[in-house]
Amino acid sequence: MALASLPKVVMGSVAFGVFWMLAVFPSVPFLPIGRTAGALLGAVLMIVFHVISADDAYASIDLPILGLLFATMVVGGYLKNAGMFRHLGRLLAWRSQGGRDLMCRVCVVTALASALFTNDTCCVVLTEFVLELAAERNLPAKPFLLALATSANIGSSATPIGNPQNLVIAFNSKISFISFLLGILPAMLAGMGINMLMLLCMYWKELDGGACSPDEVAAGKQMEAIEEGRRTALNNNKKDDGDAATPASPEDDDGGDAESMMSENISTKHRWFMQCSEHRRKLFLKSFAYVVTVGMLVAYMLGLNMSWTAITTAIALVVVDFRDAEPCLDKVSYSLLVFFSGMFVTVSGFNKTGLPGAIWNVMAPYSKINHVTGVTVLSVIILLLSNLASNVPTVLLMGDEVAAAAATISPAAVTRSWLLLAWVSTVAGNLSLLGSAANLIVCEQARRATRNAYDLTFWNHVIFGLPSTLVVTAIGIPLIGKINI
């Protein structure tokens, strides 16, 4: 795309710069309005400066992606109410053989769960569990928090529903769920293993000891303590965390919310429920939540429309709950949806200036994915941009350009270029604390924990995050797209 007129390029760059500044530094002193308002401000400036028309701005908002995000948050809320993440927490503690064993469990469970339930959701729910498990065994919290954050990002790379940038890539590339999964799965598994090995090597001495007796695990003392602390926090301080990238509130755990799907407010239930025992009612609702979620994943693999499949699953859970859905819908992070809407408009306007295309034209000859050098250059560009401009804007800015360049090589190269973009932009989030919303969630959840709080600083993270990101990215790249169907 040719460069637009100079005033349009300048005004578009200013509007995008405002968006970028507030996305990376949401509490900047002279304009502390946050990421969500910053995205809206960027969108408004694009229209006010006549970089993009109002009609084009509306057209740039990707409704299928917003619908999938919304439905995924609703389904995730019901799964938390059904105790899904509490069971994951128990799996971490069950017959633990020491600190190193627990470290491996945190890495594996978090990575696999993040691929299915998004990295942000897993970090919201599992952070306090991990803190409690480490404290019970007199183990340092830092290695486990790093394992949680980095494994969540690596694991989320494997599926289109693992993180927001993968959603964008899946919709724009038209790659099916199963092709996306198989294309990145080998890299994800290798990356998870390498990341786990690096954590063990770096913190081997600190992880000595920490074995848990079978009686203690059977009694479930760890999980009871965590739930008690979280319920106390909910009663003492009912307020929003204010993180636009957090898909659901951390207080939505099973048994901790009187408005949850599993609560027994019998007066609001259907008469059919009145004729059932309390145990059967709860068992039916929980079983239904698990069954329809499995059905949703199967539908994804069969190639059905992901957005409407997720929305259908969400509304099925709402209908079977037999209650006013407002309490459940209130837990959706609407600020995240607004952020995405503003970002779509802002990035679309910036693209219309022609500046991203002009910059890419300079880099394209050195970024061919059919050569090792080209793949290396492209990966470095994606990695740097993902940490400077965040991963979702990077995907929106570079996706079409990278795919167009790959189309001159072969159709298979186009698919591999999208998968490469998904892998590198996701793993790049592990480089620093600011590289991923999941990192910030772990940091804030750990700092605000009612029990065993821990302050994970920027430097604590980057000391491990930098080498891990470089090694995991490099090892995963040759494995991208090796399995085709």
From Swiss-Prot:
Any Pfam family matching the protein: CitMHS
Keywords: Cell membrane, Membrane, Transmembrane, Transmembrane helix, Transport
Compositionally biased region (Basic and acidic residues): 233-242
Membrane-spanning segments: 14-34, 37-57, 59-79, 106-126, 180-200, 283-303, 336-356, 377-397, 418-438, 461-481
GO biological processes: transmembrane transport
CC terms in the record's Gene Ontology section: membrane; plasma membrane
Main localization, broad class: membrane
Region entry Disordered, spans: 233-261
Entry superkingdom: Eukaryota
Zinc listed as a keyword: no
Record's bilayer topology term: Multi-pass membrane protein
Location in the cell: Cell membrane
InterPro entries per the UniProt record, alphabetical: Cit_transptr-like_dom
Family statement: Belongs to the arsenite-antimonite (ArsB) efflux (TC 2.A.45) family.
Record's function text: Silicon efflux transporter involved in silicon transport in shoots. In the nodes, involved with LSI2 and NIP2-2/LSI6 in silicon intervascular transfer, which is required for the preferential distribution of silicon, such as hyperaccumulation of silicon in the husk. Silicon is beneficial to plant growth and helps plants to overcome abiotic and biotic stresses by preventing lodging (falling over) and increasing resistance to pests and diseases, as well as other stresses.
Protein name: Silicon efflux transporter LSI3
Organism: Oryza sativa subsp. japonica
